Amino acid sequence: MSPLKIQGPIRIRSMQTGITKWKEGSFEIVEKENKVSLVVHYNTGGIPRIFQLSHNIKNVVLRPSGAKQSRLMLTLQDNSFLSIDKVPSKDAEEMRLFLDAVHQNRLNAVAMKPSQGSGSFGAILGSRTSQKETHRQLSYSDNQVSSKRGSLETKDDIPFRKVLGNPGRASIKTAAGSGITATRTIPSLTSTSTPLRSGLLENRTEKRKRMLSSGSELNEDYPKENDSSSNNKAMTDPSRKYLTSSREKQLSLKQSEENRTSGLLPLQSSSFYGSRAASKDYSPSSTNLDRTNISSQTPSAKRSLGFLPQPAPLSVKKLRCNQDYTGWNKPRLPLSSHQQQLQGFSNLGNTCYMNAILQSLFSLQSFANDLLKQGIPWKKIPLNALISRRFAHLLVKKDICNSETKKDLLKKVKNAISATAERFSGYMQNDAHEFLSQCLDQLKEDMEKLNKTWKTEPVPGEENSPDVTATRVYTCPVITNLEFEVQHSIICKACGEIIPKREQFNDLSIDLPRRKKPLPPRSIQDSLDLFFRAEELEYSCEKCGGKCALVRHKFNRLPRILILHLKRYSFNVALSLNNKIGQQVIIPRYLTLSSHCTENTKPPFNLGWSAQMAISRPLKASQMVNSCITSPSTPSKNFTFKSKSSLALSLDSDSEDELKRSVALSQRLCEISSSEQQQEDLEKDSKSCKLEPDKSELENSGFDAMSEEELLAAVLEISKREASPSPSHEDDDKPTSSPDTGFAEDDIQEMPENPDPMETEKPKTITEPDPASFTEITKDCDENKENKTPEGSQGEVDWLQQYDMEREREEQELQQALAQSLQEQEAWEQKEDDDLKRATELSLQEFNNSFLDSLGSDEDSGNEDVLDMEYTEAEAEELKRNAETGNLPHSYRLISVVSHIGSTSSSGHYISDVYDIKKQAWFTYNDLEVSKIQEASVQSDRDRSGYIFFYMHKEIFDELLETEKNSQALSMEVGKTTRQAS
C-alpha cells in the first residue's frame, strides 16, 4: 500500500530558498481537482510548502540510510530537489512506487489512502479529453462534489456496490474471466456520510449512465451497497487492488471514446445532489437538510436526469457563469494559510522580549509609514545599519514571507543591535524596556548618519529656489512619533528666580504608586501624574544664595505616541535579586496630559509633516527632526558646506586618514592668513576663475550672502579645485584638491562607493596646471612667504607616492582581515547554534518554574514617598469619564501593551497585545502564536503583568482610523464596480 504521509528529516533545494538545513517534518500527498501535490510540513510549525507533482516529476531516487531505513530523493522539472531521510524502508518504497506512478502518468491506477478507510482502488477517473468536453455541462454538479471533498477524507468503512449496467447504453464490462467487478463509491451529501477521497470519484460519464438505470435495479443493489464485508475482503490484497484499478482504467478510457462518438445528453442545472439554491450553502445544517429532502425522493426521481429535456437558455447561461467563476477550480488553501497575516515571530532562544517589542513598534502605523514611505536610499546605507535590510526589511515582509525567512530577518535585527549593545548578543533573557531603548537610540543614530553622509536628489520644484537648500533631509520616525520634550523649571523659593532646562525623552519610566489598602487600585493615570508632580530639592541659587528650590515639570512638545514604562521591579539587597511587584494597576483606555501642559506646549507633528517641509526655517537642536548640519547663512545650494568634524565622521575608513591631514592643513592655513590677505586671495582667485565662465558663475552666485569666514572657506574650496601643485602656500591643501575629497556633499556621497578615482584623478590635476592661476598664486605665495617653491612641489609628489603605498598596504590588510573574519564568523555560527539549543531548554525550564508565580507578589510598591495623588471630587470624576471617552484635551488612546509573565526580570516570558488599525481589532502576539482578544480583556488581564504601555494621541488615532475606513470603503466600491462591469 502506498502511504500518503511519511516523516523524517527534510532538506529542500530550490531557486527561491537555496539549500535549507535538515529539519524534522513530513511529506504528505494531497490530490485536489485531479492534481497531485506534495505538502511539506515542519514540526516547528509555520506555513506548509506545497509542490505540484502532476507532470512535474523529473526523477525519484531511493537509497538506503541505516538499518531498515531509506532516504527518498525527489527532483522536479524546475530542478528543485526534495529529500527526506531516515524513513522506514517499507514506507519509503511504497512512496517511491506512488511517485513513479505519478511520474509515468499512472495516477488513476494508484490508491490514494488505503490506510485511512478508503478500502479500494475502485474509483475510476475519466480521461482528460472527456472531462474537458463535458465540463461546461457538468460544472455545477462537479462544484458541489468538490466543495465537500475537504471534509470527507478521514472516515472509515466505505461501502461499495457494483456498477450498474444498462443494455440501452454502452455499459461498463470487466475483462473476461477476471472475476473482478468494477466498483465505485456512493457520492456523499453530508460531512457525516460515507467519505470520498478527493480526486478519486468515478468518471462522470459512468455516473450519468448509472443514473439512467431502472428503479428495480437500484433497489436490488442497495443491500449490496451496505454490505461492505465482502468488498473489503476482496480488496485486502494490494496486488489485486492494483490490477483491478489498471483494468478499470482501461475500461474507463474505452468507455469515454464510445461516449464521444455517441454523444451525451446535456445535464440539467438541477441534479440529484440537490437544488441550485441549496447547493450554495455548505454549512453542516444546510447539508443535512439537503440529505433529508433528497432521501425522501424515490430512487427513480434521483436517476431520471437522462429523460429530461434540453436545458433552457437561462439555465445554460447560469451554468456558464458558474463555470467562468475560477474560484471553484482553485485548490483550497490549508487552514494555516488563511492566518498568514496573523503569524508572529519565532523565538530564537529567550528572545520573547525582542518579539514583543517589535510587534508593538510595527503596529504603530505612523511610525511604519515614516520609516518606509519617504524614499530612503536603502542601497546606500551600510549593511550593518539597523534600518538597512534589517528593521525595515522585517517590517515590510513580516506579513508576506514564510516563517523561515522571517526567522532569518529576526536574526539580522538581533545581530545589528548586538553589534552595538553586546548584552543582547547571547541567548539569555533580557529586559524588554532595555531592548526598546537600545532599538530606538540605534534607529535615531542611523538616521542621523544617513542625513550627514548622503546627499540625495533635489526636492522637486526647489531646484531654482535661492532661499531654500536643495538637500533633502530624511525624517527620523523615532523623533517624529516617539520623542517628546519636557521642560524642568527650577524655581528658587527665596527669590523666585526661574531656571528652565529642557530634556528630550523617547519614553517615561513611571513609579508604581504606593497602594493604600482601603483605597481602590491606582491607575496608569495616577502614576503619570505622580511623575509630573512638583518636587523640592536642595539647590544653591546664584542670585540670592538660597538653598531650597522647587522643580516643576511640563511638556514642551508632545509626541504622537507616548510610551510609558511601569517600574515593576524592586531590588532585594539581602538576596541580590530583582523581584517583580505584581501590584494591580488599572489600565485606562485614555490618558490625559492636560494638567501637565502649558499654553506654549507644542502639539504632536501632524501626519503630513516631514523634515523637508521644515528645512527652510532654522530650528534649535532640540527641535531638529534630523541633525543634518548645514550653514544657515549660505542659502545658495552651490555652497552648502558641512563642518569638518561632521564630514570626517561621514566618510569611510579608506579616505579618513587623507581627510584628517587635509583638514589639519586647512585649519593651519586659516589661522595664519589675515582677513586682508584673504580679501586679496578672493580677488585674484576670481580673476583666475574667469577662464571657466560656467563654474565662476555658479560659485559667485552665493558670495553676496556670505560672511567673511564663509568667504574664506569658499576661497579655499576654489583654490583647491582650480590651482595646480606649484610653489605656493596652498600646497599644503593640495592633497584634498581632487573632486573626491572636496567638501561638497556630492563628492562625499561618491567617496564610499568608489574610492579609486581619488588616485586616478590626482596625476591629471598635476599634469594640467592652469598657467594664469599658476602665475598669480606664485606671486601671492611670494608675498605671504609661507612656503618655498621647489620643496613644496617635490614634497607633494612624495606625499602622493607615500599615500599610494599606504593604500596598497591597507588593501592587503583588509583582505587578510576579511579572510579571518569569515573564519571567525563560521566558528561563531557554530557556537550560536549550540547556545541556541541550550538557551531554548533553559527558557522552557525557567518559564515552567515561574509560571506558578506569574501573577507576582501582591504587595505594594514600597515607595514611601509616593503615596497618592490628591484629586478633588470633581477632578476624580472628570478623569474617570475621560478614561473611557477621551474628551479632555491632549488625550491619548491605548494601542499596545507589553506584559511580562514571571517573578523576576531574568526569567519568565514577554507577550504583547496590539491594536491593529487596519483590522480594527486587538491581537495577542505570543511569539509565533497570534490570537484575537477583546480590549476589555486586555485591560483586565494585564493589570498585574503590564510592563510597557503605548498610547497614541487621540487626534492622530482618529485621523488614522478615518483614513483606513475611507480606504476600505473605496476598495469595496471599486471591487463592486469591477464585478458589475465584468
UniProtKB/Swiss-Prot annotation:
The keyword Cell wall biogenesis/degradation does not apply. It catalyses: Thiol-dependent hydrolysis of ester, thioester, amide, peptide and isopeptide bonds formed by the C-terminal Gly of ubiquitin (a 76-residue protein attached to proteins as an intracellular targeting signal). The active site is at 352 (nucleophile), 909 (proton acceptor). GO terms for cellular component: chromosome; cytosol; nucleus. Pfam families: UCH, UCH_N, UIM. Residues 150-160, 246-260, 684-698, 720-735, 777-789 have a biased composition (Basic and acidic residues). SUPFAM superfamilies: Cysteine proteinases (SSF54001). A motif (KEN box 3) lies at residues 785-787. A motif (KEN box 2) lies at residues 224-226. A motif (D-box 1) lies at residues 71-79. The KEN box 3 is required for interaction with FZR1/CDH1 and is essential for APC(CDH1)-mediated ubiquitination. This is Ubiquitin carboxyl-terminal hydrolase 37. It comes from Sus scrofa (Pig). The gene is USP37.
